[in-house]
Amino acid sequence: ARTEGLVNPRPAELFFGRYLLFFVLSQLQAAIIVTGDLYLLKVQCLHPGAMYLTASLTAFTFSLLIYSMALSFGDVGKALVVVIMVMQIAGSSGTFPIELLPEIYQKIYRFFPFPYAIDAMRECICGMYGSYYGQQLAFLLLFAAAALLIGLLVRRPFMGLNHFMEEKLEETELL
């Protein structure tokens, strides 16, 4: 990261300073998507305010997770994010009930944030059932906390390895 003109920036300040752009873009995207769902597609939603909140928290969690993985693990982190995304789309109970999916997805789907976001959105659209909505948001916040740990703590030990991997990748002239 370029740090000219900055007086002794701490790693956390650099992390959040760079993440701010991704945060703003993800929040704008979430607001545009929910507005389009509600007013263009006319999705019947019992709790539109909660839908905006859920989309905002989901965008925050996913953008932070992607940013942390890419920053901490470099190209390997980017590849991991793609694998996680594909596995979540295939096995998150968003397209079919989880009980109808292959057994591997039934075992791993709760270890990804996507099912919690989907369940929270369902609560917003169909109606709230007890504290289930709050539980789903709490799980999303746990994934955001894990992403922060990856981005702020795990990154430092991998900096040398990432630099080595990038040099070797440049030597291959594949990218």
Question: What residue spans do the PLM features occupy?
Answer:
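Membrane-spanning alpha-helical segments of multipass transporters and channels
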Residues: A1-L175
